[in-house]
């Protein structure tokens, strides 16, 4: 058995290297690539999710973290502001006196 001769497993695709085969076809020229048009500011606004103002779109760069302040809802914080037994927001109901007078 010589070079370029198939051994029964099918015809070799490398026949053009060893002779006796056709040269490979040249690749077709790819279609010219068109550059996308620059996007307008209206299209950029569509990329921002609903409910997020463009000035607050990046929540990861905040120094205090993303779970503080007006992260999603722009509502006041429900964080506990005083230690247990400390200043109460219900002092107006109980007249603010701790001795019960």
Swiss-Prot record:
<feature type="region of interest" description="Disordered">
    <location>
        <begin position="73"/>
        <end position="101"/>
    </location>
</feature>
<comment type="similarity">
    <text>Belongs to the SPIRAL1 family.</text>
</comment>
<dbReference type="InterPro" id="IPR039613">
    <property type="entry name" value="SPR1/2/3/4/5"/>
</dbReference>
<dbReference type="GO" id="GO:0010005">
    <property type="term" value="C:cortical microtubule, transverse to long axis"/>
</dbReference>
<comment type="function">
    <text>Acts in maintaining the cortical microtubules organization essential for anisotropic cell growth.</text>
</comment>
<protein>
    <recommendedName>
        <fullName>Protein SPIRAL1-like 3</fullName>
    </recommendedName>
</protein>
<keyword id="KW-0493">Microtubule</keyword>
<feature type="compositionally biased region" description="Gly residues">
    <location>
        <begin position="1"/>
        <end position="22"/>
    </location>
</feature>
<feature type="region of interest" description="Disordered">
    <location>
        <begin position="1"/>
        <end position="54"/>
    </location>
</feature>
<dbReference type="GO" id="GO:0043622">
    <property type="term" value="P:cortical microtubule organization"/>
</dbReference>
